[in-house]
């Protein structure tokens, strides 16, 4: 007033309590960013999923928070603590990372189907051998996957799901055999043919024109001596754990 200023008491601002209207995704694994929408996200101090504090969070606006799910999480409520109080909304499902316990065979070539055992395989999005994606894979169950080896490399077997990745060491990639040449190129039953090439390890079959050799001896990874059976004109074939190779021209 013209006579001065009178005051009484103090003014206290009481912030409105936060609310959560939604969060996406509702199911997530460690490292996933969840977008939480709601109101009154001022002075946020805690964000948690299933009682486990988020690894980190960013308040984008008073109506949005982006929070990263922590490892070792749990299913349950999404919780936000702000200046106005705490809000908890149920419905979050934590997806644990998969584990890989074993696989067979442990050595394989291109096209071989490998059976992988473990846990948490539901919803698998990728399988790799030595860092090379599988040519194809099928989730048989939450504990088993069958995967086809692509042209790859030795190393870890890895399974990836929305919950993360699980790996196990010990896979050996077997390159397919190759035939450089064979002599003689024409031979009768009982004759020995010398086949030269590459990757003649673990040979399981040799044939001439589709007829299995009477016998064969792997001299080295680059040479096979094979005895012609009652054969036919056609391809010379060598099969190993890494695959089968055909070379035409035998009569």
Model-derived features with residue positions:
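Ser/Thr/Pro-rich low-complexity tracts
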Residues: 1-251
């Amino acid at each position: 007033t013209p006579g001065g200023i009178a005051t009484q008491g103090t003014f206290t601002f009481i912030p409105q309590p936060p609310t959560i209207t939604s969060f996406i995704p509702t199911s997530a694994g460690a490292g996933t960013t969840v977008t939480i929408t709601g109101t009154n996200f001022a002075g946020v101090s805690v964000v948690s999923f299933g009682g486990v504090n988020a690894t980190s969070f960013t308040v984008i606006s008073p109506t949005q928070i982006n929070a990263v799910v922590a490892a070792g999480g749990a299913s349950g409520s999404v919780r936000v603590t702000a200046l106005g109080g705490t809000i908890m909304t149920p419905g979050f499902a934590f997806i644990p990372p998969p584990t890989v316990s074993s696989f067979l065979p442990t050595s394989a070539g291109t096209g071989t189907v490998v059976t992988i055992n473990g846990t948490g395989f539901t919803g698998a999005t990728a399988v790799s051998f030595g860092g090379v994606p599988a040519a194809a894979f099928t989730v048989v169950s939450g504990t088993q996957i069958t995967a086809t080896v692509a042209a790859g490399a030795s190393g870890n077997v890895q399974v990836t799901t929305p919950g993360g990745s699980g790996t196990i060491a010990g896979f050996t990639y077997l390159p397919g055999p190759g035939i450089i040449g064979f002599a003689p190129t024409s031979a009768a039953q009982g004759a020995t043919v010398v086949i030269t090439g590459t990757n003649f390890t673990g040979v399981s079959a040799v044939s001439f024109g589709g007829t299995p050799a009477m016998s064969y001896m792997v001299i080295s990874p680059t040479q096979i001596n094979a005895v012609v059976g009652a054969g036919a004109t056609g391809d010379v074939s060598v099969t190993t754990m890494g695959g089968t190779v055909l070379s035409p021209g035998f009569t």
